[in-house]
Design a protein with these regions (language model features):
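Short, well-ordered beta-strand elements
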Residues: 23-34, 81-83, 103-107, 137-139, ...
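Extracytoplasmic/secreted proteins, especially bacterial periplasmic and envelope-associated proteins
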Residues: 48, 52, 65, 69, ...
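Cleavable N-terminal signal peptides
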Residues: 9-10, 20
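Surface-exposed binding/hinge segments that line
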Residues: 75, 119-164, 182-189
Length: 192
């Protein structure tokens, strides 16, 4: 009986340690991304990959229904202004706090990525982003714009701390690839 108990405890310890070592995730995509920079190229494989590392203000499910992601709520507060309340307590993969400053930094950067073959300007042009407090932003448009939540599903939010001065190459190398998404980026081996 004692041997059976020792065997059981030993097997349980092996299973627990085996699960702890199984921490590597390999992602397979139909097509390889052209970059890990979430704002470099608005392309299906890039966007699919970025979703694993970064988050948007608004999420969209398989039925194109919106759900809260980094924003917990959004509503038009007048004909030309939307208010987005940001989720509190969110941490970047480096441990720093997510704030409205990251959103403002993101929208400025996403429109100005050098040599982008297909940018995210389509979703940001004609909009003015204003920080109200650390967890509230207003987005203003020239005329009523009911598609604002849809546009905010597309642009991945990046860390202002990690992204300041970062190039597309810094994202590809992992130096600036700090997200809030479900997986933390470790390495990208093009063609692997």
């Amino acid at each position: 009986m004692r041997m059976l108990r020792l065997f059981t405890v030993g097997m349980a310890a092996m299973l627990i340690s085996a699960n702890a070592m199984a921490a590597e995730l390999r992602v397979g995509l139909k097509s390889e991304p052209s970059s890990i920079d979430p704002h470099y190229h608005n392309l299906g494989p890039n966007n699919a990959f970025a979703t694993q590392i970064f988050s948007s203000l608004v999420g969209s499910d398989e039925n194109q229904q919106h759900y809260p992601d980094l924003a917990v709520s959004w509503e038009p507060i007048n004909d030309t202004t939307w208010e987005f309340k940001l989720r509190k307590g969110v941490k970047w993969h480096d441990g720093s706090d997510f704030t409205a400053d990251d959103v403002i930094f993101t929208v400025e950067r996403a429109q100005n990525v050098p040599n982008s073959p297909s940018s995210f300007v389509t979703y940001l042009k004609g909009k003015t982003f204003e920080k109200i407090d650390s967890h509230t932003i207003h987005i203003k448009t020239e005329k009523p714009y009911p598609l604002m939540p849809n546009d905010m599903t597309t642009v991945k939010i990046i860390s202002a701390k990690a992204g300041t001065g970062a190039s597309t190459e810094d994202y590809n190398s992992g130096k600036a690839t700090i997200g809030t998404g479900p997986y933390k980026f470790v390495e990208w081996v093009p063609g692997d």
